[in-house]
Amino acid sequence: MIGRLRGAIAEKQPPHLVLDVNGVGYELEVPMTTLYRLPHVGETVTLHTHLVVREDAHLLYGFYEKRERELFRELIRLNGVGPKLALALMSGLEVDELVRCVQAQDTSALTRIPGVGKKTAERLLVELKDRFKAWESLPGTFTLVSNGPNHADPVASAESDAVSALISLGYKPQEASKAVSAIKEKDLSSADLIRRALKGMG
Protein backbone atom coordinates (compact mmCIF):
# COMPACT_ATOMS: atom_id res chain seq x y z
CA MET A 1 0.00 0.00 0.00
CA ILE A 2 1.16 3.54 -0.75
CA GLY A 3 1.21 5.33 2.62
CA ARG A 4 2.95 8.59 1.80
CA LEU A 5 4.08 10.56 -1.23
CA ARG A 6 6.46 13.49 -1.53
CA GLY A 7 6.71 15.39 -4.77
CA ALA A 8 5.95 18.54 -6.72
CA ILE A 9 2.38 19.55 -7.43
CA ALA A 10 1.96 19.22 -11.19
CA GLU A 11 -1.77 19.99 -11.46
CA LYS A 12 -4.55 21.21 -9.18
CA GLN A 13 -8.14 20.65 -10.31
CA PRO A 14 -10.29 20.50 -7.15
CA PRO A 15 -10.79 17.98 -5.70
CA HIS A 16 -8.06 16.26 -7.73
CA LEU A 17 -4.37 16.94 -8.00
CA VAL A 18 -1.39 15.33 -9.68
CA LEU A 19 1.80 14.87 -7.69
CA ASP A 20 5.04 14.45 -9.64
CA VAL A 21 7.22 11.97 -7.74
CA ASN A 22 10.53 11.43 -9.53
CA GLY A 23 8.89 11.83 -12.92
CA VAL A 24 5.83 9.68 -12.15
CA GLY A 25 2.51 11.52 -11.88
CA TYR A 26 0.22 10.25 -9.13
CA GLU A 27 -3.40 11.41 -9.36
CA LEU A 28 -4.98 11.89 -5.95
CA GLU A 29 -8.32 13.05 -4.67
CA VAL A 30 -8.12 15.26 -1.59
CA PRO A 31 -10.62 16.90 0.78
CA MET A 32 -10.99 20.67 0.61
CA THR A 33 -9.40 20.97 4.06
CA THR A 34 -6.20 19.57 2.53
CA LEU A 35 -6.52 21.62 -0.65
CA TYR A 36 -6.72 24.85 1.38
CA ARG A 37 -3.25 24.23 2.74
CA LEU A 38 -1.37 23.11 -0.35
CA PRO A 39 1.37 25.26 -1.87
CA HIS A 40 1.29 26.51 -5.44
CA VAL A 41 1.74 24.30 -8.52
CA GLY A 42 5.42 23.44 -8.90
CA GLU A 43 6.13 23.45 -5.18
CA THR A 44 6.90 20.32 -3.15
CA VAL A 45 4.56 18.79 -0.60
CA THR A 46 4.28 15.57 1.41
CA LEU A 47 0.87 13.90 1.58
CA HIS A 48 -0.31 10.95 3.64
CA THR A 49 -2.24 8.61 1.38
CA HIS A 50 -4.84 5.86 1.39
CA LEU A 51 -5.28 3.48 -1.53
CA VAL A 52 -8.69 2.02 -2.38
CA VAL A 53 -8.53 -0.97 -4.73
CA ARG A 54 -11.59 -1.74 -6.82
CA GLU A 55 -12.19 -4.10 -9.70
CA ASP A 56 -12.26 -1.23 -12.18
CA ALA A 57 -9.83 1.24 -10.60
CA HIS A 58 -7.16 1.96 -8.01
CA LEU A 59 -8.10 5.21 -6.26
CA LEU A 60 -5.57 7.21 -4.25
CA TYR A 61 -6.65 9.71 -1.61
CA GLY A 62 -4.29 12.29 -0.11
CA PHE A 63 -4.25 14.16 3.20
CA TYR A 64 -2.12 16.97 4.60
CA GLU A 65 -1.97 15.48 8.10
CA LYS A 66 -1.77 11.87 9.23
CA ARG A 67 -4.75 12.33 11.55
CA GLU A 68 -6.87 13.42 8.58
CA ARG A 69 -6.06 10.13 6.89
CA GLU A 70 -6.93 8.23 10.07
CA LEU A 71 -10.26 10.04 10.26
CA PHE A 72 -10.95 9.14 6.63
CA ARG A 73 -10.23 5.49 7.42
CA GLU A 74 -12.61 5.61 10.38
CA LEU A 75 -15.34 7.20 8.30
CA ILE A 76 -15.22 4.65 5.49
CA ARG A 77 -15.57 1.87 8.07
CA LEU A 78 -19.00 3.20 8.98
CA ASN A 79 -22.10 1.61 7.50
CA GLY A 80 -23.14 3.41 4.33
CA VAL A 81 -20.12 5.72 4.16
CA GLY A 82 -17.88 5.41 1.12
CA PRO A 83 -14.88 7.51 0.11
CA LYS A 84 -17.06 10.11 -1.65
CA LEU A 85 -19.18 10.86 1.43
CA ALA A 86 -16.14 10.70 3.71
CA LEU A 87 -14.38 13.34 1.58
CA ALA A 88 -17.52 15.49 1.55
CA LEU A 89 -17.67 15.37 5.36
CA MET A 90 -14.00 16.23 5.66
CA SER A 91 -14.30 18.99 3.07
CA GLY A 92 -17.12 20.65 4.95
CA LEU A 93 -15.55 20.37 8.41
CA GLU A 94 -12.05 20.50 9.85
CA VAL A 95 -11.08 17.48 11.96
CA ASP A 96 -11.49 19.40 15.21
CA GLU A 97 -14.87 20.78 14.10
CA LEU A 98 -16.11 17.29 13.33
CA VAL A 99 -14.85 16.05 16.68
CA ARG A 100 -16.73 18.83 18.46
CA CYS A 101 -19.91 17.94 16.55
CA VAL A 102 -19.54 14.32 17.66
CA GLN A 103 -18.86 15.26 21.27
CA ALA A 104 -21.91 17.55 21.34
CA GLN A 105 -23.99 15.22 19.13
CA ASP A 106 -24.76 18.30 17.00
CA THR A 107 -26.37 17.38 13.69
CA SER A 108 -26.74 20.91 12.31
CA ALA A 109 -23.24 21.17 10.82
CA LEU A 110 -23.44 17.73 9.21
CA THR A 111 -26.81 18.33 7.57
CA ARG A 112 -25.36 21.30 5.64
CA ILE A 113 -23.20 18.84 3.71
CA PRO A 114 -24.75 17.51 0.46
CA GLY A 115 -25.96 13.94 0.83
CA VAL A 116 -26.30 14.07 4.61
CA GLY A 117 -29.86 14.23 5.92
CA LYS A 118 -30.91 14.47 9.56
CA LYS A 119 -31.27 10.71 10.06
CA THR A 120 -27.92 10.02 8.43
CA ALA A 121 -26.27 12.72 10.55
CA GLU A 122 -27.75 11.28 13.75
CA ARG A 123 -26.56 7.78 12.87
CA LEU A 124 -23.06 8.96 11.99
CA LEU A 125 -22.71 10.90 15.23
CA VAL A 126 -23.76 7.92 17.34
CA GLU A 127 -21.41 5.53 15.52
CA LEU A 128 -18.50 7.97 15.64
CA LYS A 129 -18.85 8.76 19.33
CA ASP A 130 -17.52 5.38 20.47
CA ARG A 131 -14.74 5.42 17.89
CA PHE A 132 -13.61 8.88 18.96
CA LYS A 133 -13.49 7.80 22.61
CA ALA A 134 -10.89 5.22 21.59
CA TRP A 135 -8.99 7.87 19.64
CA GLU A 136 -8.76 10.16 22.66
CA SER A 137 -6.31 7.73 24.24
CA LEU A 138 -3.86 8.30 21.39
CA PRO A 139 -1.43 11.17 22.12
CA GLY A 140 -1.93 14.18 19.86
CA THR A 141 -4.80 12.70 17.88
CA PHE A 142 -7.32 15.36 18.82
CA THR A 143 -5.18 18.21 20.13
CA LEU A 144 -6.18 21.50 18.58
CA VAL A 145 -3.45 22.61 16.22
CA SER A 146 -2.89 25.47 13.85
CA ASN A 147 -3.82 24.78 10.26
CA GLY A 148 -0.48 26.16 9.18
CA PRO A 149 0.04 28.62 6.36
CA ASN A 150 -2.81 29.09 3.98
CA HIS A 151 -1.33 29.39 0.50
CA ALA A 152 -3.83 31.50 -1.39
CA ASP A 153 -4.46 30.73 -5.04
CA PRO A 154 -4.03 33.47 -7.66
CA VAL A 155 -6.96 35.88 -7.43
CA ALA A 156 -7.88 35.44 -11.10
CA SER A 157 -8.66 31.75 -10.64
CA ALA A 158 -9.96 31.84 -7.06
CA GLU A 159 -13.64 32.04 -8.02
CA SER A 160 -13.48 29.26 -10.61
CA ASP A 161 -11.55 27.05 -8.17
CA ALA A 162 -14.16 27.69 -5.49
CA VAL A 163 -17.04 26.85 -7.85
CA SER A 164 -15.29 23.64 -8.95
CA ALA A 165 -14.72 22.65 -5.35
CA LEU A 166 -18.38 23.21 -4.41
CA ILE A 167 -19.52 21.16 -7.40
CA SER A 168 -17.21 18.35 -6.27
CA LEU A 169 -18.95 18.45 -2.89
CA GLY A 170 -22.27 17.69 -4.56
CA TYR A 171 -23.75 21.13 -5.19
CA LYS A 172 -25.29 21.87 -8.58
CA PRO A 173 -23.22 24.13 -10.87
CA GLN A 174 -25.82 26.91 -10.74
CA GLU A 175 -25.98 26.74 -6.93
CA ALA A 176 -22.20 26.82 -6.64
CA SER A 177 -21.81 29.72 -9.05
CA LYS A 178 -24.59 31.71 -7.37
CA ALA A 179 -23.15 31.15 -3.89
CA VAL A 180 -19.68 32.32 -4.92
CA SER A 181 -21.02 35.32 -6.86
CA ALA A 182 -23.04 36.41 -3.81
CA ILE A 183 -19.88 36.96 -1.77
CA LYS A 184 -19.20 40.69 -1.65
CA GLU A 185 -15.66 40.70 -0.26
CA LYS A 186 -12.95 41.15 -2.86
CA ASP A 187 -9.53 39.53 -3.37
CA LEU A 188 -10.37 36.45 -1.31
CA SER A 189 -8.52 33.19 -1.77
CA SER A 190 -10.40 30.16 -3.08
CA ALA A 191 -10.29 28.68 0.43
CA ASP A 192 -12.03 31.73 1.92
CA LEU A 193 -14.55 31.79 -0.91
CA ILE A 194 -15.42 28.14 -0.31
CA ARG A 195 -15.84 28.68 3.42
CA ARG A 196 -18.09 31.71 2.95
CA ALA A 197 -20.12 29.99 0.25
CA LEU A 198 -20.69 26.94 2.46
CA LYS A 199 -21.86 29.18 5.31
CA GLY A 200 -24.16 31.03 2.98
CA MET A 201 -25.75 27.81 1.74
CA GLY A 202 -26.00 26.34 5.27
Swiss-Prot record:
Recorded superkingdom: Bacteria
Region Flexible linker, residue ranges: 144-153
Cited InterPro entries: DNA_helicase_Holl-junc_RuvA_I, Hlx-hairpin-Hlx_DNA-bd_motif, NA-bd_OB-fold, RuvA, RuvA_2-like, RuvA_C, RuvA_C_sf
Region (Domain III): 154-202
Record-level Gene Ontology MF annotations: ATP binding; four-way junction DNA binding; four-way junction helicase activity
Keywords linked to the UniProt accession: Cytoplasm, DNA damage, DNA recombination, DNA repair, DNA-binding
UniProt entry tagged with the keyword Glycoprotein: no
Region described as Domain I: 1-64
Role noted for this protein: The RuvA-RuvB-RuvC complex processes Holliday junction (HJ) DNA during genetic recombination and DNA repair, while the RuvA-RuvB complex plays an important role in the rescue of blocked DNA replication forks via replication fork reversal (RFR). RuvA specifically binds to HJ cruciform DNA, conferring on it an open structure. The RuvB hexamer acts as an ATP-dependent pump, pulling dsDNA into and through the RuvAB complex. HJ branch migration allows RuvC to scan DNA until it finds its consensus sequence, where it cleaves and resolves the cruciform DNA.
Similarity annotation: Belongs to the RuvA family.
Entry's free-text remark on domains: Has three domains with a flexible linker between the domains II and III and assumes an 'L' shape. Domain III is highly mobile and contacts RuvB.
Name used for this protein in its record: Holliday junction branch migration complex subunit RuvA
Organism this protein belongs to: Pseudomonas syringae pv. tomato (strain ATCC BAA-871 / DC3000)
